[in-house]
């Protein structure tokens, strides 16, 4: 398969909520950003329900989230995609990666990894120390014996080494040749060169991650058999033709990893079920990562904070326009959080105000910019 990778033309954005509970203000803020990014250019917006992690799924949460989005005035095109219905596609993707020789079994428990690694400040991303990669390199017979014995294991994807990397590649394949072939300036501001993933984020400007040192070999199939988030979102975005991704800045590092997975999939012959036939598939999507929204204590908003979820706010008779107006203010699209509709923001939408001021924000009841309805919800 030959793919032409270009920029320009219509784009496809997506909502990708996890049905683990009711949406809160922080979720709506991200959803509004994604919707405006696509709709301001007259482009497609799709819906994906990320329900692959079955233990986290709350029954009925998907319908509540879609109802809340309709109530807010945030629409999408076509029918929703459900990850729970796509196991065959993920199995196929796994085989494409396996053909590239970039996968290996990992027998480490979470406790083992926590003991050997330290999370990165800011996003909590934990770089795997490569224990089982070294085991495969130094003692392949032991690995084979453990697999035959049926020892529980996850599957990891190996990262390419940077030019400065000193670790020996332990997965016997030629996939290192996948990286570094095309300079970033020829890849639409995004690419992987000498084991370094580069992309020009529309909010946080150019980003560079050494995949081996700053990302590390990552799980794409868990020990319990469930497919990993990092794999399924790449497969889904390829199949949906998504090339406009908006999400929180805590996923900046994950973007580098997903670029590598995407590149390996396409090199392994992955054939996307792309519904967007108006232009050829982009090699890498465009990205906008948003500042995080914290609670008054400085911790990131979570769905367990029920006073700020959509059910609680709607029960307080807060209007859609009040919520959208506040989220527009969080996106730096208006100087004060005055009520408005999503459509009111389309004509003047730009990432430039947020790019110029992308500090995280905390929701505080005593802040003079906090509207009364939100101050009351914050207690």
From Swiss-Prot:
PROSITE patterns named in the record: AA_TRNA_LIGASE_I
GO biological process, one term: glutamyl-tRNA aminoacylation
UniProt-listed Pfam families: tRNA-synt_1c
Binding positions (L-glutamate): 14-18, 50, 229, 247
Binding locations of ATP: 303
Gene Ontology annotations for the cellular component aspect, listed alphabetically: cytosol
Motif extent ('HIGH' region): 17-27
InterPro entries: Glu/Gln-tRNA-synth (IPR000924), Glu/Gln-tRNA-synth_Ib_cat-dom (IPR020058), GluQ/Sye (IPR049940), Rossmann-like_a/b/a_fold (IPR014729)
Motif mapping: 'KMSKS' region: 300-304
Cofactor section: Zn(2+)
Summary of the function given for this chain in its UniProt record: Catalyzes the tRNA-independent activation of glutamate in presence of ATP and the subsequent transfer of glutamate onto a tRNA(Asp). Glutamate is transferred on the 2-amino-5-(4,5-dihydroxy-2-cyclopenten-1-yl) moiety of the queuosine in the wobble position of the QUC anticodon.
Name recorded for this polypeptide: Glutamyl-Q tRNA(Asp) synthetase
Organism of derivation: Bifidobacterium longum (strain NCC 2705)
Primary gene name: gluQ
């Amino acid at each position: 398969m030959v793919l032409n990778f270009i920029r320009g033309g219509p784009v496809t954005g997506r909502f990708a909520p996890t049905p683990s509970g009711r949406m809160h203000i922080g979720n709506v803020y991200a959803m509004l950003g994604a919707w405006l990014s696509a709709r301001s250019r007259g482009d497609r917006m799709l819906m994906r329900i990320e329900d692959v992690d079955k233990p986290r799924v709350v029954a009925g949460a998907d319908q509540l989230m879609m109802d809340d989005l309709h109530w807010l005035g945030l629409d999408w095109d076509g029918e929703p995609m459900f990850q729970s219905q796509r196991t065959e596609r993920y199995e196929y993707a796994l085989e494409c990666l396996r053909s590239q020789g970039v996968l290996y079994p990992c027998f480490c428990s979470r406790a083992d990894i926590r003991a050997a690694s330290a999370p990165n400040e800011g996003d909590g991303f934990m770089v795997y120390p490569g224990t089982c990669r070294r085991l495969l390199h130094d003692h392949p017979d032991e690995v084979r014996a453990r697999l035959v014995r049926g020892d529980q294991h996850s599957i990891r994807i190996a990262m390419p080494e940077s030019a400065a990397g000193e670790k020996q590649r332990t997965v016997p394949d030629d996939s290192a040749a996948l990286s570094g072939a095309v300079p970033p300036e020829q890849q639409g501001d995004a690419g992987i060169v000498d084991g370094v993933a580069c992309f020009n984020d529309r909010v946080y400007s150019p980003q560079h991650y050494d995949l081996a040192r700053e990302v590390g070999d990552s799980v794409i199939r868990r020990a319990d058999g469930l497919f990993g988030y990092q794999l399924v979102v790449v497969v889904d975005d390829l199949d949906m033709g998504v090339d406009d991704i908006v999400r929180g800045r805590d996923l900046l590092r994950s973007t580098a990893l997903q670029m590598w997975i995407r590149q390996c999939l396409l090199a392994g012959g992955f054939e996307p079920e792309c519904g967007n036939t108006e232009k050829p598939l982009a090699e890498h999507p465009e990205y906008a990562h948003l500042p995080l929204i914290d609670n008054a204590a400085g911790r990131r908003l979570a769905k367990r904070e029920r006073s700020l979820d959509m059910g609680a706010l709607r029960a307080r008779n807060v209007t859609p326009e009040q919520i959208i107006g506040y989220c527009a203010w969080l996106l730096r699209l208006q100087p004060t959080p005055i009520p408005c509709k999503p459509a009111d923001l389309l004509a003047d939408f730009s990432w430039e105000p947020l790019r110029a001021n992308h500090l995280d924000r905390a929701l505080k009841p005593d802040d003079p910019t906090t509207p009364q309805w939100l101050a009351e919800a914050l207690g």
